Amino acid sequence: MFEIHPVKKVSVVIPVYNEQESLPELIRRTTAACESLGKEYEILLIDDGSSDNSAHMLVEASQAEGSHIVSILLNRNYGQHSAIMAGFSHVTGDLIITLDADLQNPPEEIPRLVAKADEGYDVVGTVRQNRQDSWFRKTASKMINRLIQRTTGKAMGDYGCMLRAYRRHIVDAMLHCHERSTFIPILANIFARRAIEIPVHHAEREFGESKYSFMRLINLMYDLVTCLTTTPLRMLSLLGSIIAIGGFSIAVLLVILRLTFGPQWAAEGVFMLFAVLFTFIGAQFIGMGLLGEYIGRIYTDVRARPRYFVQQVIRPSSKENE
């Protein structure tokens, strides 16, 4: 039997990108939720290259009297998951909770995640109830969840919700993974022995707009497909085999038709030949694009450039920049 260690210190990791309107409320509510735990805690706010006043507000929050806030400033925008990984590399708690800065997932749910983790779970996920998102966001989320479940075999209900709790050894394992395209909830479930999901409230966004545009969702879909599995390459080989068999069958059929109806039939079959040709060319371009995605991922990983660059770290105790 594995020994279950009680949670002694909680680290809350929150990526921030142009969230100056929501920051005061976010800090107040997250601090209140952590105070109610009766445990040691820290709140790590990672500025992901914001162009508004977010970074300055984070520095002020860290330097306030009695603050528990650690501000991590990245030199530019690297994306949500890279920013969270930057926060993971600076945590000191034995339970790490991730949370979005838009307050759609209430910080008041944090005590429930801590209580569930204290039962011995490595990962505590959440499922958003009564989602306050647009029809497009809900549909895209369902498609992504189904894709992940099919490729990973992990039947988790809501991979898109970033309100999650991870034991320290899970975070340490993720930090040892150096691939550039990282999707944290899936990566955590790969290392987790015991994982569970609990329902949580979901509020309407009060400040700003979602940072996930249509194109960013498309890019996320490509990242998920290419960083999780090589199944698309196997499917591409299968598709190529089917097309080759189909092409050979059509060639045999055309020879039979020519012998049956004579050479005058050949001119009438030109348009069908063009249709078949364009179908094959289209399939080839799809395959080339998919191979290009995989090769691009390999090229990016082989260069081994850091996935983020931390410009400053402001801790409340010393109030000095690292």
From Swiss-Prot:
**Which pathway does the protein contribute to?**
Glycolipid biosynthesis; 4-amino-4-deoxy-alpha-L-arabinose undecaprenyl phosphate biosynthesis; 4-amino-4-deoxy-alpha-L-arabinose undecaprenyl phosphate from UDP-4-deoxy-4-formamido-beta-L-arabinose and undecaprenyl phosphate: step 1/2; Bacterial outer membrane biogenesis; lipopolysaccharide biosynthesis
Q: Which residues cross the membrane?
A: 236-256, 270-290
CDD domains with a match to the protein in the record: DPM1_like_bac (cd04187)
One biological process term in Gene Ontology: 4-amino-4-deoxy-alpha-L-arabinopyranosyl undecaprenyl phosphate biosynthetic process
Q: Which GO terms describe its molecular function?
A: phosphotransferase activity, for other substituted phosphate groups; undecaprenyl-phosphate 4-deoxy-4-formamido-L-arabinose transferase activity
Reactions listed under catalytic activity: UDP-4-deoxy-4-formamido-beta-L-arabinose + di-trans,octa-cis-undecaprenyl phosphate = 4-deoxy-4-formamido-alpha-L-arabinopyranosyl di-trans,octa-cis-undecaprenyl phosphate + UDP
Q: Where are the Cytoplasmic topological domains?
A: 1-235, 291-322
Membrane topology reported for the UniProt record: Multi-pass membrane protein
Show the Pfam families listed in the entry: Glycos_transf_2 (PF00535)
Q: Does the keyword Lipid biosynthesis apply?
A: yes
Checking SUPFAM superfamilies in the record gives: Nucleotide-diphospho-sugar transferases
Principal location:
membrane
Could you tell me the superkingdom of the organism this chain comes from?
Answer: Bacteria
**Transmembrane among the record's keywords?**
yes
Residue ranges, Periplasmic compartment?
257-269
Family recorded in the similarity comment? Belongs to the glycosyltransferase 2 family.
Biological role: Catalyzes the transfer of 4-deoxy-4-formamido-L-arabinose from UDP to undecaprenyl phosphate. The modified arabinose is attached to lipid A and is required for resistance to polymyxin and cationic antimicrobial peptides.
The name of this protein is: Undecaprenyl-phosphate 4-deoxy-4-formamido-L-arabinose transferase
Gene responsible for this protein:
arnC
